[in-house]
Amino acid sequence: MNDSGVSKIYASALLGAVNSPEEVEQELGDLVQLLFKEEKIRNFFLSPTVSIEEKENILEKNLRGKILDVTLNFLGVLLNKGRFINLPEIQKRFTVELDKKKGRVRAQIKSYPSLEPAQITKLGSILSEKFKSEFILEVSEDKTLLGGFVVQFNDLKIEKSIASQLGEIKKAMLEKKLPVGAVYEN
């Protein structure tokens, strides 16, 4: 089984075992940041020369009382099953599975210039109304757009950028074989 399948199984199992999935989702995100972003910490937990017991003791000592017991126990399961390396992917899959369960859709919005908060709110409302789902918007600026915005979620892409509009005009001109440029007569 590939890592993606393994991650989905572990994420689904964890989601089924927790009473407060939003809290676990937050904790998993924080743990991935803590345990995988710093090279020395990541190398310690992924090292085959460090015993599982030593890794569990470090987690227990530093995390007991700071995260839910179910999350700490889950980390222990990952260590014992040799799946600790999959934690970042499991965290992503957990969020995807929780979003499905809650009827949420995560949409990436790239724009240039940056959208105003009121525009983001209105765009979220329009998406929610049109697609009958709660949308979580992840907004970023992309100067390559020249102007406008692009919304992506699931397998859908909505382009309202100057670059895409220019592309549509070009396509229409090529299809109709419209002359481009000025015509001069002598």
Curated annotation (Swiss-Prot):
Pfam families on file = OSCP (PF00213)
Regarding the membrane, this protein is recorded as: Peripheral membrane protein
> What does the entry list under GO cellular component?
plasma membrane; proton-transporting ATP synthase complex
- The UniProt entry lists the main location of this chain as membrane
Q: Which GO terms describe its molecular function?
A: proton-transporting ATP synthase activity, rotational mechanism
Entries under InterPro entries matching the protein: ATP_synth_OSCP/delta_N_sf (IPR026015), ATPase_OSCP/dsu (IPR000711)
Cell location: Cell inner membrane
Q: Which domain of life is it from?
A: Bacteria
Q: Which UniProt keywords apply?
A: ATP synthesis, Cell inner membrane, Cell membrane, CF(1), Hydrogen ion transport, Ion transport, Membrane, Transport
Subunit annotation: F-type ATPases have 2 components, F(1) - the catalytic core - and F(0) - the membrane proton channel. F(1) has five subunits: alpha(3), beta(3), gamma(1), delta(1), epsilon(1). F(0) has three main subunits: a(1), b(2) and c(10-14). The alpha and beta chains form an alternating ring which encloses part of the gamma chain. F(1) is attached to F(0) by a central stalk formed by the gamma and epsilon chains, while a peripheral stalk is formed by the delta and b chains.
NCBIfam families according to UniProt: ATP_synt_delta (TIGR01145), PRK13434.1 (NF009969)
Family note = Belongs to the ATPase delta chain family.
* Its biological purpose: F(1)F(0) ATP synthase produces ATP from ADP in the presence of a proton or sodium gradient. F-type ATPases consist of two structural domains, F(1) containing the extramembraneous catalytic core and F(0) containing the membrane proton channel, linked together by a central stalk and a peripheral stalk. During catalysis, ATP synthesis in the catalytic domain of F(1) is coupled via a rotary mechanism of the central stalk subunits to proton translocation. This protein is part of the stalk that links CF(0) to CF(1). It either transmits conformational changes from CF(0) to CF(1) or is implicated in proton conduction.
Which protein are we looking at?
ATP synthase subunit delta
Instruction: Give the species.
Output: Leptospira borgpetersenii serovar Hardjo-bovis (strain JB197)
